[in-house]
């Protein structure tokens, strides 16, 4: 029996899956770790922690499966992080993560130096504090000695691939999130690099997500106690892998993922599409596919915040049990989920959240429902941008915490006015990484073929017409609050 391994390098944990040729997850393993916050707004980690977590996971898997049966490994990784290595291949400093916000001045400088229109033309995206380019410019401005030592920069998953194989690559889905990459040309923007005086040689070579990066080095094999070769494939960005693992391989379905943040994602392959900066426009890990993505920064984070305020000891199932006792519209209460600012469509780091319509009759159930509705309204702003771009949205695959509560699934169907589908067995981005490894191993001819064979769906939730009409009016009110 042959197996592939998918590994997701998350912010707080590394998750590993073993998948057989039928697409069944036969083993999983997780390793948790902590990030460092040495100053306000800073978020860092020693990249060797990811590598040690990877080795621990592989040792666990190898204790349960014959290494000759494990034929391929691939990765999903958190986007936008900056890892820099020197000529000897050693990390120069801790990795700066996606949720690090120290780069506000660099963002303004980049916009001033390039101009927003030029930036959109060169990369098809705007620049934000969490992205890789301003982190690199921050190093240039604040740690000049470290900047001068840079041999290559990498994204988090690419560093692990490098440690396992000795080869430095990245691929389009992660490169797009650096804002140094032309999404349409699928290569580094040499003009942008030149205008910002960044040496192009520090950029890793681009290969396809399912292209072979190499094999485990002899040093790694000795550490793991094996002698067989295992192929390593480059992998993809976490959102791309999450979409792939949910069956989003073409324009037929869209994705909504509600975790700490919320994501709405749709394939967008029109050659005429021009991003105005309100959404992200990135390359998929599926060849020749691109997607647009809107982000709600405080999705599940908002619900966790409310739970800690009013019922910290309850689990989420109990916390949300009776929210249908509050009517559509939460009895006149509305919530804006701007606890950490907002991404789509406002790109506003300073705006803050609010409850509107509180009165003496407001109940805890009203507050719970208002928060869920507010999160879903925010994601619906991204859905509306997609609809305005002539994307035909007939079915949305919902994953994450928002898919684990039937009442919230109904609210999604009603607010989005679209059929909501859930996965039979949701495994997150690590499953998409395993699919990339399987494609690299040539188990299938296309990702569509693999998706049809491997991806199963659990239930469909349909919009209720009377609820949808009410939510359309409420959503129009919601959109006026920011203005």
Curated annotation (Swiss-Prot):
How would you classify this enzyme at the top EC level? transferase
Q: Which GO terms describe its molecular function?
A: ATP binding; D-xylulokinase activity
Q: Where is this site: Important for activity?
A: 8
Chemical reaction(s) catalysed: D-xylulose + ATP = D-xylulose 5-phosphate + ADP + H(+)
Do the record's keywords include Transferase? Answer: yes
Q: List the disulfide bonds.
A: none
Give the EC number(s) listed in the UniProt record. 2.7.1.17
**PANTHER family in the record, alphabetically?**
SUGAR KINASE, XYLULOSE KINASE
- Please state which protein family the record places this protein in: Belongs to the FGGY kinase family.
Summarizing the function annotation, the protein's role is: Catalyzes the phosphorylation of D-xylulose to D-xylulose 5-phosphate.
Name of protein: Xylulose kinase
Gene from which the chain derives:
xylB
């Amino acid at each position: 029996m042959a197996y592939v391994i998918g590994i997701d390098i998350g912010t707080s944990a590394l998750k590993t899956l073993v998948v057989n040729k039928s697409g069944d997850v036969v083993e999983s393993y997780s390793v948790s770790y902590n990030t460092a916050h040495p100053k306000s707004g800073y978020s860092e980690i020693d990249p060797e922690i990811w590598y040690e977590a990877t080795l621990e996971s592989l040792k666990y898997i190898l204790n349960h499966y014959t290494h000759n049966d494990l034929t391929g490994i691939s990765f999903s990784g958190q986007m936008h992080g900056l890892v820099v290595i020197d000529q000897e291949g050693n990390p120069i400093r801790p990795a700066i993560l996606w949720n690090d916000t120290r780069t506000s001045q660099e963002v303004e400088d980049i916009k001033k130096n390039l101009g927003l229109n030029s930036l959109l033309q060169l990369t098809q995206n705007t620049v934000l504090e969490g992205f890789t380019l301003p982190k690199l410019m921050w190093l240039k401005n604040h740690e000049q000695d470290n900047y001068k030592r840079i041999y290559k920069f990498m994204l988090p998953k690419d560093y692990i691939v490098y440690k396992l194989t000795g080869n430095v690559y990245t691929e389009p889905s992660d490169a797009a999130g650096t804002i140094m990459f032309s999404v349409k040309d699928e290569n580094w923007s040499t003009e942008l690099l030149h205008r910002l005086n960044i040496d192009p040689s520090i950029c890793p070579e681009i290969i396809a997500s399912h292209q072979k990066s190499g094999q485990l080095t002899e040093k790694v094999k000795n550490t793991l106690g094996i002698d067989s070769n295992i192929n390593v494939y480059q992998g993809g960005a976490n959102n791309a892998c999450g979409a792939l693992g949910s069956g989003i391989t073409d324009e037929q379905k869209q994705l909504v993922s509600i975790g700490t943040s919320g994501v709405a994602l749709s394939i967008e392959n029109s050659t005429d599409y021009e991003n105005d900066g309100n959404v992200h426009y990135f390359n998929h890990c599926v060849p020749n596919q691109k997607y647009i993505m809107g982000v709600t920064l405080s999705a599940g984070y908002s619900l966790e915040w409310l739970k800690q305020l009013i019922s910290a000891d309850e689990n989420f199932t109990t916390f949300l049990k009776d929210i249908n006792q509050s009517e559509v519209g939460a009895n006149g209460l509305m919530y804006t989920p701007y606890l950490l600012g907002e991404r789509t469509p406002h790109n506003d780091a300073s705006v803050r959240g609010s409850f509107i319509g509180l009165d003496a009759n407001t109940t805890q159930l009203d507050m719970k429902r208002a928060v869920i509705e507010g999160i879903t309204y925010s994601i619906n702003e991204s859905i509306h941008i997609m609809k305005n771009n002539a994307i035909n949205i007939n079915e949305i695959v919902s994953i994450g915490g928002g898919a684990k509560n039937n009442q919230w699934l109904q609210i999604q169907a009603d607010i989005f006015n679209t059929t909501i589908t859930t996965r039979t067995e949701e495994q997150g981005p690590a499953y998409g990484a395993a699919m990339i490894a399987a494609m690299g191993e040539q188990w299938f001819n296309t990702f569509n073929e693999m998706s049809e064979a491997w991806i199963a769906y659990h239930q469909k939730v349909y919009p209720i017409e009377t609820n949808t009409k009410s939510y359309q009016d409420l959503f129009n009110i919601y959109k006026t609050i920011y203005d």
